[in-house]
Amino acid sequence: MDPFATGGGMLQTEDQWYIFYHRQTNRSSYARQACAEKLERRSDGGFQQAEITSCGLNQGALKGIGTYEARIACNLWSINGTGRYDGKSPKQKLKDHPYFTQSGKDRENNGDQYIANMKNGAVAGFKYFEMGEANQIGITIQGNVMGTMQVSDKSDFENICAEIEVNGSGKEMHTYKGALNIPSGKRALFFRFQGEGTVDFHSFELMKD
């Protein structure tokens, strides 16, 4: 596999196989971010289809305590669903959709990628975390916003695990915190903005008080 290509490929390291692929950033089909997922073998020697997660080359679920950058989200959609960047005028057509970007130009180091343009009803999903200790959650965002960031372990938000009030303006980073009530075990985390304005979502922290 060419390690510099993001078109996709399989790699074996010791006894474990991984699939490498890419996804689009900056609302362009020409801006690409390399990603990887762990593969599981079937009894016939083939591979099960890999689920897209936030775990990458990590050996299992991420720790349920710590700070994580929003750029590791594996699900991202607006109140109107998802879209494709390979059509005509994608930036205009998808102007109400969230997207991955960074400050400044693309670069090989000192990255600060984040999720931009989260409007009312937009969702960012992260899979998976080994929960059990955290009972507080914080989010670091910027933007002119007023509303609530809801957190759930379900993509349909049937179970609300946290509601964090947000009220900020300008380009300053703001951190907001709230109580977290989530079942123990391997869990996903979905963040949904409900309110006015546009959120740039930079990171979140899982904490124990």
Where is each model-derived feature located?
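Carbohydrate-active catalytic/glycan-binding domains of CAZyme proteins
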Residues: 1-209
